[in-house]
Amino acid sequence: MPEKSKSFEMVEGLRLGLDRIKGEDGIIGYILRDVKSASIDIRDPSKIIDYAVLSSTALESGESVSEVFGLGDVSSVVVEGKDVKVLLIPIGSSRVSVFMRRDVDHEKVYKDL
Protein backbone atom coordinates (compact mmCIF):
# COMPACT_ATOMS: atom_id res chain seq x y z
CA MET A 1 0.00 0.00 0.00
CA PRO A 2 1.44 3.42 -0.91
CA GLU A 3 2.62 5.53 2.04
CA LYS A 4 0.21 8.39 1.25
CA SER A 5 -2.79 6.05 1.22
CA LYS A 6 -1.66 4.39 4.45
CA SER A 7 -1.32 7.78 6.16
CA PHE A 8 -4.79 8.80 4.92
CA GLU A 9 -6.32 5.62 6.35
CA MET A 10 -4.60 6.23 9.69
CA VAL A 11 -5.96 9.79 9.87
CA GLU A 12 -9.47 8.64 8.93
CA GLY A 13 -9.30 5.98 11.65
CA LEU A 14 -8.15 8.66 14.04
CA ARG A 15 -11.14 10.85 13.15
CA LEU A 16 -13.47 7.97 14.00
CA GLY A 17 -11.66 7.42 17.30
CA LEU A 18 -11.92 11.12 18.16
CA ASP A 19 -15.66 11.05 17.45
CA ARG A 20 -15.99 8.07 19.82
CA ILE A 21 -14.07 9.59 22.73
CA LYS A 22 -15.17 13.24 22.52
CA GLY A 23 -18.30 12.59 24.57
CA GLU A 24 -16.54 10.63 27.30
CA ASP A 25 -16.41 12.03 30.81
CA GLY A 26 -13.39 14.26 31.32
CA ILE A 27 -12.60 14.84 27.64
CA ILE A 28 -12.49 18.59 26.97
CA GLY A 29 -11.95 18.36 23.24
CA TYR A 30 -9.42 17.89 20.49
CA ILE A 31 -7.55 19.52 17.65
CA LEU A 32 -6.65 17.46 14.58
CA ARG A 33 -4.48 19.38 12.14
CA ASP A 34 -2.51 18.71 9.02
CA VAL A 35 -0.59 20.92 6.62
CA LYS A 36 -3.72 22.39 5.01
CA SER A 37 -6.49 22.32 7.60
CA ALA A 38 -7.60 21.66 11.16
CA SER A 39 -10.62 20.07 12.81
CA ILE A 40 -11.36 21.53 16.22
CA ASP A 41 -13.90 20.31 18.75
CA ILE A 42 -13.44 22.10 22.09
CA ARG A 43 -16.25 22.41 24.64
CA ASP A 44 -15.32 25.99 25.54
CA PRO A 45 -14.88 27.93 22.27
CA SER A 46 -13.35 30.88 24.13
CA LYS A 47 -10.27 28.74 24.84
CA ILE A 48 -9.58 27.52 21.30
CA ILE A 49 -6.62 29.86 20.77
CA ASP A 50 -5.13 28.95 24.16
CA TYR A 51 -5.42 25.24 23.42
CA ALA A 52 -4.02 25.67 19.90
CA VAL A 53 -0.95 27.50 21.22
CA LEU A 54 -0.45 24.91 23.98
CA SER A 55 -0.78 22.10 21.45
CA SER A 56 1.74 23.52 19.01
CA THR A 57 4.27 24.57 21.63
CA ALA A 58 4.14 21.34 23.62
CA LEU A 59 4.61 19.05 20.62
CA GLU A 60 7.48 21.13 19.25
CA SER A 61 9.14 21.12 22.68
CA GLY A 62 8.75 17.36 23.00
CA GLU A 63 10.25 16.81 19.56
CA SER A 64 13.15 19.16 20.38
CA VAL A 65 13.92 17.34 23.63
CA SER A 66 13.80 14.02 21.80
CA GLU A 67 16.24 15.30 19.18
CA VAL A 68 18.66 16.82 21.72
CA PHE A 69 18.82 13.61 23.76
CA GLY A 70 18.70 11.22 20.80
CA LEU A 71 15.48 9.54 21.92
CA GLY A 72 14.27 8.81 18.39
CA ASP A 73 10.88 9.50 16.86
CA VAL A 74 8.21 10.91 19.16
CA SER A 75 5.15 8.66 19.34
CA SER A 76 3.31 10.89 21.83
CA VAL A 77 3.78 13.72 24.32
CA VAL A 78 1.76 14.28 27.49
CA VAL A 79 1.75 17.61 29.31
CA GLU A 80 0.00 17.76 32.68
CA GLY A 81 -1.09 20.94 34.40
CA LYS A 82 -2.91 21.54 37.65
CA ASP A 83 -6.36 20.63 36.28
CA VAL A 84 -5.89 19.74 32.61
CA LYS A 85 -3.57 17.61 30.53
CA VAL A 86 -3.04 17.20 26.83
CA LEU A 87 -2.07 14.12 24.84
CA LEU A 88 -0.27 15.03 21.62
CA ILE A 89 0.25 12.46 18.86
CA PRO A 90 2.09 13.10 15.58
CA ILE A 91 0.91 10.89 12.69
CA GLY A 92 2.77 11.55 9.47
CA SER A 93 2.13 15.18 8.58
CA SER A 94 -0.92 15.28 10.88
CA ARG A 95 -1.03 16.12 14.57
CA VAL A 96 -3.74 15.35 17.11
CA SER A 97 -4.09 16.96 20.51
CA VAL A 98 -6.63 15.61 22.99
CA PHE A 99 -7.39 17.83 25.97
CA MET A 100 -8.75 16.23 29.13
CA ARG A 101 -9.11 16.66 32.86
CA ARG A 102 -5.99 15.67 34.73
CA ASP A 103 -7.64 12.58 36.27
CA VAL A 104 -8.46 10.99 32.89
CA ASP A 105 -6.28 7.99 31.93
CA HIS A 106 -4.41 9.30 28.87
CA GLU A 107 -3.01 5.83 28.11
CA LYS A 108 -6.56 4.52 27.70
CA VAL A 109 -7.39 7.50 25.46
CA TYR A 110 -4.28 6.76 23.37
CA LYS A 111 -5.30 3.10 22.99
CA ASP A 112 -8.89 4.05 22.14
CA LEU A 113 -7.64 6.20 19.28
Enumerate the predicted regions with their spans.
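Acidic, low-complexity cytosolic segments
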Residues: 1-26, 35-113
